Swiss-Prot record:
Protein name: Glucose-1-phosphate adenylyltransferase
Subunit structure: Homotetramer.
Residues the record lists as binding beta-D-fructose 1,6-bisphosphate: K39, R419, E420, M421, L422, R423, Q429, E430, R431
UniProt entry tagged with the keyword ATP-binding: yes
Domain of life the protein comes from: Bacteria
Reactions listed under catalytic activity: alpha-D-glucose 1-phosphate + ATP + H(+) = ADP-alpha-D-glucose + diphosphate
Function: Involved in the biosynthesis of ADP-glucose, a building block required for the elongation reactions to produce glycogen. Catalyzes the reaction between ATP and alpha-D-glucose 1-phosphate (G1P) to produce pyrophosphate and ADP-Glc.
Record-marked site positions (Could play a key role in the communication between the regulatory and the substrate sites): Q74, W113
GO BP terms, alphabetized: glycogen biosynthetic process
Transmembrane segments: none
Organism of this sequence: Salmonella paratyphi B (strain ATCC BAA-1250 / SPB7)
Activity control summary: Allosterically activated by fructose-1,6-bisphosphate (F16BP) and inhibited by AMP.
Protein keywords: Allosteric enzyme, ATP-binding, Carbohydrate metabolism, Glycogen biosynthesis, Glycogen metabolism, Nucleotide-binding, Nucleotidyltransferase, Transferase
Amino acid sequence: MVSLEKNDRVMLARQLPLKSVALILAGGRGTRLKDLTNKRAKPAVHFGGKFRIIDFALSNCLNSGIRRIGVITQYQSHTLVQHIQRGWSLFSEEMNEFVDLLPAQQRMKGENWYRGTADAVTQNLDIIRRYKAEYVVILAGDHIYKQDYSRMLIDHVEKGARCTVACMPVPIKEATAFGVMAVDESDKIIDFVEKPANPPAMPGDASKALASMGIYVFDADYLYELLAADDKDDASSHDFGKDIIPKITREGMAYAHPFPLSCVQSDPQAEPYWRDVGTLEAYWKANLDLASVTPELDMYDQNWPIRTHMESLPPAKFVQDRSGSHGMTLNSLVSGGCIISGSVVVQSVLFPRVRINSFCNIDSAVLLPEVWVGRSCRLRRCVIDRACIIPEGMVIGENAEEDARRFYRSEEGIVLVTREMLRKLQVKQER
């Protein structure tokens, strides 16, 4: 354990990111989001009115001072690659800054694609070694949060760790979806179980468990050794949570980093914000929260901007139709290029170029880019996928049986509508 003075911390906050490379694991399909990820990887899914999910990890890197980034892709990567090429070409090659796209290419012997999260890094080691980084920051590309990775790097150095795992308390009922750990008084991880059926509770709070966030800092040389050994282990599933972290824990080399120490938030008293948005309900709820009066995630913090690909779009427009009805919104996010004509939009998120025609009522809905809503529609508690054309007079979110028959309806009552579902519905109606 190294004790650092304030001046040392300030200096390290500048130096450590320059000695680091971030690897963003962005190849996941996100099957729990159902048809929303049929044609795009989960990190490429739209979020928050104008962003993609991966923009949060990329923005955290940029704001933390990490300007050497590798994005590891696999499933349905075209949309993701296109987004990064268009929106993240701001780095200077002359200053050794970059975002490298690392698609699965079966570089190593055999015909395997990425077998797990650790294998995704292993198969790119020939490229990663060329970065000559002292530290490797492993990130998931499908979470919504704001974090200063330089603070986590300082914690890693101060504790003398070879591996540091970001963690936060989660409700015990939700902990089955995470790696769960136990730590001692120095934050050394003394036990780690990936997605346990019966998660162990935190000492002093039986309602919560200490969960891994899938954010890791490694000494680079130590990581390379671990991955080389793991690649030769036929019994391994080649996954950080299932194999690598438990092994390091047994060797006494892993330390925990409490997320509140590096979480970036405008209100110091607020609960640290981190969302998986892995289910349709979580995705819908996290989007709508941004439209509330006091959202849990501050998207307006100029000191920690979330960047994305910016299209040249006209301002949103609210117009009065010929009948005299006004286009109105309440507690909603409305992006550029949207037109609301003689309709009411309440507690909803409208992505760019959404068109809502007259006499519609939109309530608690997430409308992705280029959605067109015909006249006299009522949409409630739903997610409408990109470029869907909602026919005139359609009602969604009011009749559970009808919604389940026509579209996908979650157990919580959130309705997902895609172009393919609408096409099939039209074919049925024409028969």
